[in-house]
From Swiss-Prot:
Coiled-coil spans in chain: 206-229, 309-371
Subunit structure: Part of the activated spliceosome B/catalytic step 1 spliceosome, one of the forms of the spliceosome which has a well-formed active site but still cannot catalyze the branching reaction and is composed at least of 52 proteins, the U2, U5 and U6 snRNAs and the pre-mRNA. Recruited during early steps of activated spliceosome B maturation, it is probably one of the first proteins released from this complex as he matures to the spliceosome C complex. Component of the minor spliceosome, which splices U12-type introns.
UniProt family annotation: Belongs to the cyclophilin-type PPIase family.
Annotated protein name in UniProt: Spliceosome-associated protein CWC27 homolog
Modified residues (N-acetylserine): S2
Organism taxonomic ancestry: Eukaryota, Metazoa, Chordata, Craniata, Vertebrata
SUPFAM superfamilies, A to Z: Cyclophilin-like
Keywords: Acetylation, Coiled coil, Nucleus
GO MF term (any one): peptidyl-prolyl cis-trans isomerase activity
Effect of inactivating the gene: Knockout mice manifest significant embryonic lethality. Growth retardation, lack of neural tube closure, and absence of limb buds are observed at embryonic day 12.5. Surviving mice show growth retardation and retinal dystrophic changes.
Pfam annotation, one family: Pro_isomerase
Basic and acidic residues: compositionally biased ranges: 175-193, 231-241, 302-341, 356-368, 454-469
The keyword Acetylation is annotated on this UniProt entry: yes
Composition-biased stretches (Acidic residues): 256-278
């Protein structure tokens, strides 16, 4: 990332966007893109972007906003007409967090802008880059993408800009205009479509079919009774407490017109009151019916669970029985094979070595058969053998040399206990320097006074010999 910061020019200008996803700091390149920065700053000062939505979200690509109509086709620049593109060699779409002008073609810039969510080389030399998102506010910018999007890249619950604040204005000559922001031309019906209505999925319920039938019946009755008075006889046909005979017979047509008018008003109020009562009563009946169906379905489900459980228990019993039978058959086969092998060994005429091996084998097999089975008795036997072995070791250690067992010539089970380890004595003996020995080493030092004296004497003798000659 360091090479990006080195390549990008320094910024001059800063704006703070307060959105529903959090604050977003934008630093501007007012020297590289003066027209786009002047347009953006003046629109922020004029509160042009207040309460506008981010109408387009493309995950991993861009988040677009700045249209007061919210349709993606509105928005005007401060110049009264679209202004030209401003490209710079040091500004490229090579990372996220860049702010650029949105347009429909070359030199068609208005008020709409977008944030980049990643590298977008295909936008180079097509859109004017005029700012960048700085600091930790880039994470608030990424939160703008955390919305549900339809097939047309429009968010169903879009984030919006609450207000704008210019922190540093590089253009001192900007004077905000008094303009009226265009109203949202989107019809109310289209706005309502953005929030889809929830549908009742009766298939998720165990009693879904009955609930769906009850719902259809309620809808059908409400449609048929719409616009006219309703009676409890129309809905509760199977209630024995209700009588089909009216409690008070209606007056005949010879009543006066004033009385008829008064009766109509009273009947209208009474119909409204009865309509509310009937709705509440119908809801209670449906709730009771659903509870009964739910309890019945739970019972049936419980019975159904018991049956498979009993079936699975039977299968487990059969598996255990089959396993026991297979194990018994295997043991029977092994015993038969052993008996057959014993017969063959007895029938064969073995030599001496084989006969000795068989005797040893029979001996150890007999000992193995004498051992008790696993349990407390086996444990007691093991402890007894261990204590016997300890006593043997103690006896071998405490024996005196007079009573020691002589070393056996032939190895047996107890011969190793009477064996004594003896090691070679490798201690160094002190040698006398005056004694000549085969291991004596001569040490000659020419600096030794004795050696010097010997050399002088030898030289003197050599000179005397030469003189004699």
């Amino acid at each position: 990332m360091s090479n990006i910061y080195i390549q990008e020019p320094p910024t001059n200008g800063k704006v703070l966007l307060k959105t529903t996803a959090g604050d977003i700091d934008i630093e501007l390149w007012s020297k590289e893109a003066p027209k786009a920065c002047r347009n953006f700053i003046q629109l922020c000062l004029e509160a042009y972007y207040d309460n506008t939505i981010f109408h387009r979200v493309v995950p991993g690509f861009i988040v677009q906003g700045g249209d007061p109509t919210g349709t993606g086709t509105g928005g005007e620049s401060i110049y009264g007409a679209p202004f030209k593109d401003e490209f710079h060699s040091r500004l490229r779409f090579n990372r996220r967090g860049l702010v650029a002008m949105a347009n429909a073609g070359p030199h068609d810039n208005g008020s709409q802008f977008f944030f980049t969510l990643g590298r977008a080389d295909e936008l180079n030399n097509k859109h004017t880059i005029f700012g960048k998102v700085t600091g930790d506010t880039v994470y608030n910018m990424l939160r703008l993408t955390e919305v549900d999007i339809d097939d047309e890249e429009r968010p169903r619950n879009p984030h919006r800009i609450k207000s704008c604040e210019v922190l540093f204005n590089p253009f001192d000559d900007i004077t905000p205009r008094e303009i009226k922001k265009p109203k949202n031309e989107k019809p109310e019906e289209e706005v309502k479509k953005l929030k889809p209505k929830g549908t009742k999925n009766f298939s998720l319920l165990s009693f879904g079919e009955e609930a769906e039938e009850e719902e259809e019946e309620v809808n059908r009755v409400s449609q048929s009774m719409k616009g006219r008075s309703k009676s409890s006889h129309d809905l509760l046909k199977d209630d024995p407490h209700l009588s089909s005979v009216p409690a008070v017979e209606s007056e005949k047509d010879d009543a006066t017109g004033d009385l008829e008018d008064d009766g109509e008003d009273d009947s209208a109020e009474r119909d409204e009151y009865m309509e509310d009562d009937e709705k509440n009563l119908m809801r209670e009946r449906i709730a009771k019916r659903l509870k009964k169906d739910a309890s019945a379905s739970v019972k049936s489900a419980g019975d159904g669970e018991k049956k498979p459980a009993s079936r699975s228990e039977e299968l487990r019993k059969e598996a255990r029985q089959l396993k026991r039978e297979l194990l018994a058959a295997k043991q029977k086969k092994e015993t038969a094979i052993k008996v057959e092998e014993g017969r063959e060994e007895e029938e064969a005429a073995p030599d001496g070595a084989v006969a000795e091996y068989r005797r040893e084998k029979q001996k150890y097999e007999a000992l193995r058969k004498q051992q008790p089975k696993k349990g407390t008795s086996r444990e007691d036997q093991t402890l007894a053998l261990l204590s016997q072995f300890k006593s043997k070791l103690t006896q071998a250690i405490t024996e005196t040399p007079e009573n020691s067992v002589p070393e056996a010539e032939v190895e047996d089970d107890e011969g190793w206990m009477s064996h004594v380890l003896q090691f070679e004595d490798k201690t160094r003996k002190v040698k006398d320097a005056s004694m000549q020995d085969s291991d004596t080493f001569e040490i000659y030092d020419p600096r030794n006074p004795v050696n010097k004296r010997r050399r002088e004497e030898s030289k003197k003798l050599l000179r005397e010999k030469k003189e004699r000659r």
